[in-house]
């Protein structure tokens, strides 16, 4: 009997062991750090990480994205936590769909990677309001990100909520889960100088609060040089080989190695050559760095109204190794994969010693690491931006391309050079899907009735977000002006000029129901002015200004105080009595569009809506027009997009879900040749000059049904829906 039990016990042990080996689920129990590296279960690790933000893709995409990240050589998935997505109103929480944080982390765990959970809860990230819920702005006495009681109370409450949720699911490494790191605050250093002692006090409070949550894993602060112990301060940037942590017993970590850059409407599309990105990573490693996170590894899509900035595009592709649609971008993906393999071959030596640096020439160096049993690793570097170099190292000859590093895991043989790219460049095409739009219909916003429903009236011009609370991009400002019958312009004289000064971001101007034009700011200059001659009549004239937000700011000192909307002046010039300032007269305000209040985007919207159908629906190209059409899901499994080049500016929905803002703003910039060598900045390698910044808009296949998918567009400027199409993204 004893023998039988022993045999059964061995069989059970074998089966359990086999299951664990076959499973890639991460199992941790101890995460600490020392001066060299993050230490997991007693072992120093070189950790390669990539940012994937769960709301910027769909749950159906997550597993494939994470598997591609693992296959690309990553150890860790990094993500922010998006407060405004999770707590849209005080005490009301959302952890469903794209905001299902638990499902996202479980997926990472099941694939077999670690997690760096950057709780913040300020995220920046080109995300609307930097991740803060707009209601937070209206808490009595609040001031963001400083030694302020109301802010600290709200921040602590949300942070505790997330930490407790992670603990309940046993997600922290100390519980056997995948979370090995957490971040409190984010990129605070740029704002610290302006805050003085209150800023330092806030940093110390945030650190103490986070550590007191007893997660059992290290906490970091990125771009915060005075992060107090035991918090690890880390680096963000295009390069971080210059960075040293604030204490000699902390590891050297790079939380954001920028793989590219974001795009803004009206701007070019930045590209970062992979040769330079790999060079930056290898430079960091050879200087003793042990943790690198690519921001972004998959950028994804700013669905809905989540894009910040303002003026950040719906696409958040970021020139990442995995593109917006979930396809690998070559040669970036494979070249970095080969870099990761080379670094991992060197791991034992890299975490065992500091580099010994030897000059090999004016621009050339050798960084040598050694470990036990004669182990030797070398990084041979050529910093020259134009010329290759021939060097001698260990009595052997090597050729180093310009601006490159060769990695020698045995101090003899080169296994990788950052500037020598073997992978072929992806050939990306947007091809017809075969799916056509049918049952096209149109609904025109009724300008004449604005001011008659759901309005407030006040003297003077009100700040936009104070009225809308960011429930909509749109706010109507309407007023009436009386014109004397004796005005000379009514008898053939020059029309008066209307000027409107706005704090951002766009405005469409109507007088007596007639459209007189639009004006826009930019991300760099949100404020702008509109000016146009207008045809007024004797008696009462109605001025209607539709102010449009294009994402709330996500970065800058106390950006919660920045104004949006028409808060400058509104003036009529050229009247017989001179100028007439309308700014302080009675104005009526209406948040949102009629189509929004009627829920025209919903597949179950009221059938009594008077849509214009048939050929007439395609003929009107006036501003403020709703379009709807239907299409069937294209065959195959290629990613899909809407081609909106024929449209102007607005928003788009598929089956009631917003795919984001669109705008055919044409890119201005210098799109000349791009040399990988030399220091990279976001304006160095530009593409897309003379084309719309974003023409195609991602349509997740999981949002579609086989037949009868509803497309709704709200067009602000005037467009041609007959030329809108559904396309497939093809990569060869």
UniProtKB/Swiss-Prot annotation:
Task: List, in alphabetical order, the GO biological process terms annotated in this UniProt record.
Answer: carbohydrate metabolic process
Where in or outside the cell it occurs: the entry states:
Secreted, Extracellular space, Apoplast
Q: Which PROSITE patterns match?
A: GLYCOSYL_HYDROL_F35
Q: In which tissues is it expressed?
A: Expressed in leaves and flowers.
Q: Does the keyword Hydrolase apply?
A: yes
Keywords carried by this UniProt record: Apoplast, Glycoprotein, Glycosidase, Hydrolase, Secreted, Signal
Instruction: List, from the UniProt record, the residues annotated as the active site of this protein.
Output: 187, 256
Q: Which InterPro entries match?
A: BetaGal_gal-bd, Galactose-bd-like_sf, GHD, Gly_Hdrlase_35_cat, Glyco_hydro_35_CS, Glycoside_Hdrlase_35, Glycoside_hydrolase_SF
Is Secreted set as a keyword in this record?
Answer: yes
The protein's GO terms of the molecular function aspect are: beta-galactosidase activity
What positions does the record give for glycosylation? 466
Residues of the signal peptide: 1-23
Family statement: Belongs to the glycosyl hydrolase 35 family.
Q: What is this protein called?
A: Beta-galactosidase 5
What organism is recorded for this protein? Arabidopsis thaliana (Mouse-ear cress)
Q: Which gene encodes it?
A: BGAL5
